[in-house]
Structure formats: C-alpha cells, structure tokens
A protein has these predicted regions:
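Retroelement reverse transcriptase polymerase core
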Residues: 1-196
Length: 196
C-alpha cells in the first residue's frame, strides 16, 4: 500500500504491478441496493463435502468479466495522474458487485448447481462419485465456461484431486476440516496491546 500526493492509498501487488482501487462510497450511498442473497458458507461446505473426487476452478478476475451497461459506465468515472477513465467492466468497490456476480454465476450454472458442482462467487467446485463421473462433470462445466466466455485462472485450478480448500476449509470424502495452516497463523498473531 502506498500513498499518492493527495494522501489516497493505492494498493500494489508484488506479482502484477499496480492495482487501481477507487473509493465508490459516494456512489454506493445513492445506489439502489440489490439484496440478492449470497449462499451460506456452511451450506456450501455441506453440499460439496463427502465426495471422493474434486476439481477446483477459479474464475479469472471475477468481477471484471461482467460488462457494465453503456449508460452506467459514466458512474464509474475516476481521475488519476494519467487521465480520466470509466470502467467498461465491473470493478471492485461497487456495493452491488457481489450480488450481481453471484447471480450471474448461478444463472450460468443453473442446471448444474447442487447436482455436479457448486459455485460461490468465482470459486467453482466440481465433484463426482468416481474418477470417471468427476471427469464427465468437469467436461460439462468447462463446456459451459467456453459457451458463456467465462475465463478461468488455470494457475489456481486443481483437477481430479481427493481434497482441497473451499472457502478456507479442507473438504474431502471424509467431510469438512479446519485448515490447520490458517489456525496456526491466528495462534501466532501477537496479543493485542491496546484496548478500544
């Protein structure tokens, strides 16, 4: 995180350079809220656990795959030292972005959800009772991704595995387990030194 000359914080990523973060609080205040519910994490975990084979797919730059209506693009306008810009695709920071994205993903996979796969935002879990069944299910999901121009981040995808991490939990045929690496990180945190 670095600050520009106006004291605004700009997030940086070591691997991919600059990442633009826009403060859309003023826009969000006047935006009519979309109350589309996100799935409950515990229910997602229950549905995906207990299978012998999995494929874990990750949507590439999730929100950014959704186009913004031309009439709404001007609402995302921002100015930076390089000029004035407006997004053509949905950025982070818009209050309705999570609901819009989840609705879109559920629409894309409406006939597959809870039967051969589960989707939570840009995380897609495909499963099967046998290796062959999981492979057939994966093929169906990948065909749908191609059909709908949904781009995946292959570096974050895992294919035909016995277990994996979903929403911070380890899932497998045995069920749901806590990710011990996450617990260790929390245990190693220093104790708070101030009280608010």
């Amino acid at each position: 995180m670095v600050q520009n000359e106006k004291g605004e914080e700009i997030t940086t990523r070591l691997t991919s350079g600059w990442r633009v973060c826009i403060d859309y609080r003023k826009l969000n205040v006047v935006t009519r809220k979309d109350h589309f519910p996100l799935p409950f994490i515990d229910q997602v975990l229950e549905r995906v656990s207990g299978h012998p084979f999995y494929c874990f797919l990750d949507g590439y730059s999730g929100y950014f795959q959704i186009e913004i209506d031309v009439a709404d693009q001007e609402k995302t306008t921002f100015t930076c030292p390089f000029g004035t810009y407006a997004y053509r695709r949905m950025p982070f920071g818009l209050c309705n972005a999570p609901a819009t994205f989840q609705r879109c993903m559920l629409s894309i996979f409406s006939d597959m959800g809870e039967r051969i796969m589960e989707v939570f935002m840009d995380d897609i879990t495909v499963y099967g009772g046998t290796f062959e069944e999981c492979l057939v299910n994966l093929e169906a999901v990948l065909h749908r991704c191609i059909e709908k121009d949904l781009v995946l981040n292959w570096e974050k995808c895992h294919f035909m595995v016995r277990q994996g991490i979903v929403l911070g939990h380890i899932i497998s045929e045995k069920g749901i387990e806590v990710d011990k690496a996450k617990v260790e990180l929390i245990v190693k945190l220093p104790s708070p030194t101030t009280v608010k």
